[in-house]
A protein has these predicted regions:
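Extracytoplasmic metal-acquisition and chelation regions
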Residues: 2-10, 17-174
């Protein structure tokens, strides 16, 4: 178990270091390039772990910018409008994504809210934000920082891979 957790943590570190080093996604026989837009660079990195270079991946919040204080712009709504899948954490972390989806005229089924996609069947137990020791009390209820736990990050990677494979079965062989 420890070895597996270390491996996942190492993969996350490598993906963060390699951000931007991959090649562009290519169109496939059954459709154009699949565009995945993540709310943060962290979730974009997890998406790269999940799907490699099979899809085009970008993030809304630039690296180094705090998701808690980020203010989306009209250009972000335009980026959402052209995305096939929007990957967010949910659980109140990137609460602005709902308004951005509406502004872009995007349906809710284009959103994969990772934290809300996990449940007991995944072996995940949510921590109360107060019990977790989350600094500042910025979140009500559940602690949304699931990806900080290697098991949580691995579950996020699995959820992203499963969703892209379901959306585009032609890409599943490349994932």
């Amino acid at each position: 178990m420890r070895r597996r957790i270390r491996s996942i943590a190492a993969l996350i570190c490598i993906s963060v270091a390699a951000t931007g080093c991959g090649s562009a996604a290519e169109p496939t026989a059954s459709g154009g390039t699949y565009r995945l837009l993540a709310t943060t660079s962290v979730f974009a990195d997890l998406a790269r772990l999940a799907v490699g270079d099979a899809v085009q991946i970008e993030s809304i919040v630039p690296a180094g910018v705090d998701v808690h204080t980020f203010e989306p712009s009209p250009s972000d709504a335009a980026r959402i409008a052209s995305a096939d899948l929007i990957v967010a954490n949910g659980l109140g972390l990137d609460a602005w994504i709902g308004k951005l989806l509406n502004a872009a005229g995007k349906r809710g089924d284009a959103l994969l809210s990772l934290g809300e996609a996990l449940d007991a069947s995944d072996g995940w137990i949510y921590l109360d934000a107060d019990a977790s020791g989350a600094a500042g009390g910025a979140h009500d209820g559940v602690d949304p920082h699931i990806w900080l736990d290697p098991k949580g990050a691995a579950l996020y990677v699995q959820k992203i891979a499963a969703r892209v494979s379901a959306d585009r079965p032609d890409l599943a062989v490349r994932i």
